Curated annotation (Swiss-Prot):
Organism, as annotated: Prochlorococcus marinus (strain MIT 9312)
Similarity comment text for this entry: Belongs to the bacterial ribosomal protein bL35 family.
Name used for this protein in its record: Large ribosomal subunit protein bL35
NCBIfam families noted in UniProt: rpmI_bact
One GO location term (cellular component): cytosolic large ribosomal subunit
GO terms for MF: structural constituent of ribosome
Signal peptide: none
GO annotation terms (biological process): translation
Listed InterPro entries: Ribosomal_bL35, Ribosomal_bL35-like, Ribosomal_bL35_CS, Ribosomal_bL35_sf
Keywords of this entry: Ribonucleoprotein, Ribosomal protein
Gene3D superfamilies listed in its UniProt record: 4.10.410.60
Cited Pfam families: Ribosomal_L35p
């Protein structure tokens, strides 16, 4: 069987943890940040865990993670 290809766009967006979960960036932290509070911006700068309902799709896109 041939090797599976990794979707490079997904590989740049998601990182696997040691336990097999995937981490992602939060939305709403790219631009238009003036009216957002410091607390919100600090929260948005942290990583989030990919929801378990989406984890299977991410795993298919990054087979060797």
């Amino acid at each position: 069987m041939s090797k599976l290809k990794t979707r490079k766009s997904a590989a740049k967006r998601f990182k696997a943890t040691a336990t097999g979960k995937f981490m992602r960036r939060r939305a709403y932290h790219n631009h238009l940040l003036d009216h957002k509070s410091s607390k919100l911006k600090r929260h948005l700068s942290t990583k989030a865990v990919v929801d378990e309902r989406d984890a299977d799709n991410v795993k298919l896109m990054i087979p060797y993670a």
